[in-house]
């Protein structure tokens, strides 16, 4: 079983909180601890520090799940790797970045020849990516969800919620209200006591 903890509002949930929670989850029988960075808010040096502390305090594998919404996902994964993270989530390049995960090929190339070499073959990954490039073209993905939006560092909206928001605004012919809606999110979250914006909260 994997226990996941969402990273969000630093003023409410700090590093010590997450380390203590991970230790409790391990005692309860978790086989892995997953840091779920639902909106790419975990910055690279914070990831390094958190993973280092988790590795020093729990014995089960540490798994990092982040996105590339704010454009720091690749750096966050790299710093987590330097700190000893056991697992990171990536996506093949045709389906990567923005509200998705950082690109697999980029991380594989970056770590090649280091102590964290993944052992993956870039040429084979390129062949697989070529297939999924055709799949991505058929999916007609809104290009906005694959772009970096550094405003996410302020609004803290997770990738899945962001892509759904864009779709709903498009259906309502209100795409021009996108940034107005995002600006309202932090105020509403504060009123509700800073809940994490993951299911079920993200569906409200």
Give, region by region, the residue ranges found by the protein language model.
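Terminal or standalone catalytic/regulatory effector modules within metabolic enzymes
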Residues: 146-151, 156-204
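Alpha/beta enzyme core
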Residues: 9-60, 78-85
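Mobile "lid/hinge" segments at catalytic clefts and subdomain interfaces of large enzymes
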Residues: 100-104, 111-114
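Glycine-rich phosphate-binding active-site loops on the catalytic face of alpha/beta enzymes
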Residues: 83-100
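Alpha-helix-loop-beta-strand connector modules within alpha/beta enzyme cores
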Residues: 5, 47-64, 109-120
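Short, small-residue-biased leader/transition segments that mark boundaries at the very start
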Residues: 1-8
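Short, small-residue-enriched loops and turns at beta-alpha junctions
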Residues: 9-14, 37-45, 68-73, 94-99, ...
């Amino acid at each position: 079983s994997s226990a996941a903890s969402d990273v969000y509002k630093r003023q409410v949930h700090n590093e010590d909180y997450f380390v203590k929670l991970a230790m409790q989850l391990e005692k309860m029988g978790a086989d892995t601890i997953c840091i779920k960075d639902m909106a790419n808010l975990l910055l690279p040096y914070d990831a390094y520090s958190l993973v280092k502390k988790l590795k020093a305090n729990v014995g089960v594998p540490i798994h990092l799940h982040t996105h590339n919404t704010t454009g720091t996902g690749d750096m966050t994964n790299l710093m987590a790797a330097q700190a000893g993270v056991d697992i990171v989530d990536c996506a093949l390049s045709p389906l990567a970045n923005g509200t998705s995960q950082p690109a697999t090929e980029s991380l594989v190339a970056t770590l090649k020849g280091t102590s964290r070499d993944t052992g993956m073959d870039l040429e084979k990954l390129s062949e697989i990516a070529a297939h999924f490039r055709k799949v991505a073209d058929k999916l007609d993905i809104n290009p906005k969800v694959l772009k970096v939006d550094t405003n996410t560092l302020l609004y803290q909206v997770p990738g899945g919620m962001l892509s759904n928001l864009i779709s709903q605004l498009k259906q309502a012919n209100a795409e021009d209200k996108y940034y107005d809606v995002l600006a309202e999110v932090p105020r509403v979250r504060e009123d509700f006591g800073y809940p994490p914006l993951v299911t079920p909260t993200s569906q409200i």
